[in-house]
UniProtKB/Swiss-Prot annotation:
Protein purpose: Catalyzes the phosphorylation of N-acetylmannosamine (ManNAc) to ManNAc-6-P.
Subunit structure: Homodimer.
Taxonomic placement: Bacteria, Pseudomonadati, Pseudomonadota, Gammaproteobacteria, Enterobacterales
EC number of the protein: 2.7.1.60
The keyword Transferase is annotated on this UniProt entry: yes
Protein name as catalogued: N-acetylmannosamine kinase
Family affiliation: Belongs to the ROK (NagC/XylR) family. NanK subfamily.
Organism: Shigella flexneri
Gene name as annotated: nanK
Pathway it works in: Amino-sugar metabolism; N-acetylneuraminate degradation; D-fructose 6-phosphate from N-acetylneuraminate: step 2/5
Amino acid sequence: MTILAIDIGGTKLAAALIGADGQIRDRRELPTPASQTPEALRDALSALVSPLQAHAQRVAIASTGIIRDGSLLALNPHNLGGLLHFPLVKTLEQLTNLPTIAINDAQAAAWAEYQALEGDITDMVFITVSTGVGGGVVSGGKLLTGPGGLAGHIGHTLADPHGPVCGCGRTGCVEAIASGRGIAAAAQGELAGADARTIFTRAGQGDEQAQQLIHRSARTLARLIADIKATTDCQCVVVGGSVGLAEGYLALVEMYLAQEPAAFHVDLLAAHYRHDAGLLGAALLAQGEKL
């Protein structure tokens, strides 16, 4: 069965055909509409999928935000603008006349990463550290999404009750500290206004403040991983995202995790897939997993 897989992100929309062999073909990409209106998103999705839909039997969507009853929600509604409650599944079914599923992009990526693992692994957690912090949980060989689509949103667990306010409305979330946005927001002095990429570059050049910001992020993530081990007893944690895969970052996380009691240690792995994990995971789910 060939799946028309779609990835909806904050800056880009991607689509591709993915067969039973897992090969990605005819990949297309468009910018996410800046206007954040339902009409603009529908038009962009139509342009994206129209050349591909005749070659597919199902549609699978991996999207930023929370997917509940086929519609788009978010922990921080302001991130979606006019797209809050956008009917993703219904829209794609109308555009393509194909059966459609939708899932959070980090949950989809977690499923792709799980399928790439070697050995007898039944329980794993995927964490993406990028602009935000997201994740997905596989338990007993099954992806956990939850009845409301919230499962795996581990970036919104508490890291510091006296920390910065997160976009979700809580104070001191992991995302508000460890993410690329969190790293940049904490920069002061000559680093004020710099993005995470610049801060990583400066850290590599020996800038003390930049190094401290990255260590703060890695330490926060290590504590989250210890909490995850305590709550899931997972066999491994896979780390991805632009921050998670930045040079030297995972080694720092491993160093701080080693400082936790041994019961909370767990194998850390770098993500196998990068940009297209959401596309592939959604397609794999559409080919055999009931959501």
